[in-house]
């Protein structure tokens, strides 16, 4: 099992994730994504969007505002019900979520005793003001989830897209929660990104579609992101764990170095959200669906798939990370990312920094850069350059040597196996495309 300290070290050293405001001492639970981190996030988002929107003719996209009218959060139940229970240790003053610790045992921080305060409720929403006057009339919240922006746009999307039940609305965006405790690197933070889809169905079809989306989402992690199946599992919520809006819920959990934790939730939200907004807005017809074939009118039920993008980044790094002992006794660190997710698809190396080789290398770079994100490197030994690319997950390295001048061939080295092939420059594009398309993951890594 990979160690969390190895992931954090790699993330900072190679430019995936940096501590936010580090030059000023850092801000707890806040992280900046570096050059490789933004590429990995972008690639995961791209695959999620493709799997949700492009591969389903009845799912469309939305990008709703972070700031919305505060009535929306009162209607959704977040103002009154979106809270965690917290306790403080009276000895060391540390604060904990009550459901994260055993209150009958010693404080996990100071170990002195179980001298805790009584649990008290703590609302997780960030409140701020819009305008020049800070009073109750200018209060707004940073959204704690992206879902409500979808629900209040139900009628807009339905009418403008000419959709029929069942259909879905997908969205990727930032959400904010004033977490009592931020921990485990980028896993639990106050600012994060969600990839959510709300699927609207006839009430009588809710169970059928709930089962469909459970399996669909698990397949996404295994078949698209190539996450190890033995590190994924379903976990059902019992009645005491359900959110205020949910009738049923399953989590997809991944085995992180700190244990199994949620990366995506699949929820049967019933008609709770649409009914609440119909009531609070006093516009019931806006949230009602009229089936023109059956003449039936009803408020649709909703199945939600809610994945954490930032958690998916951490999961992907943990799952891809490996350390290998080589035959010469050396060790290499490899990120076995699927090529679709790798920040760079190709690295191009002139064997030495001589103009006759760098000119060819630059020409190949320009020929391929429209279709592949490429890293160009002409410093250091070839062995060191290979190791640098292994660490960041680049699947293919292309070396231009003196034979290239003679026969227009290059050496293509594959990351996982370290095998090398001579390929004609004119065939390089199609070769890399085919290799990515036919990539097979070894889950026994």
From Swiss-Prot:
Listed Pfam families: HGTP_anticodon, tRNA-synt_2b
Key words of the record: Aminoacyl-tRNA synthetase, ATP-binding, Cytoplasm, Ligase, Nucleotide-binding, Protein biosynthesis
Sites where the protein binds ATP: 177-179, 187-192, 262-263, 308-311
Chief location of this protein within or outside the cell: cytoplasm
UniProt EC number: 6.1.1.14
Top EC group: ligase
Catalysed reactions, semicolon-separated: tRNA(Gly) + glycine + ATP = glycyl-tRNA(Gly) + AMP + diphosphate
Name of this chain's protein: Glycine--tRNA ligase
Source organism of this protein record: Borreliella burgdorferi (strain ATCC 35210 / DSM 4680 / CIP 102532 / B31)
The encoding gene: glyQS
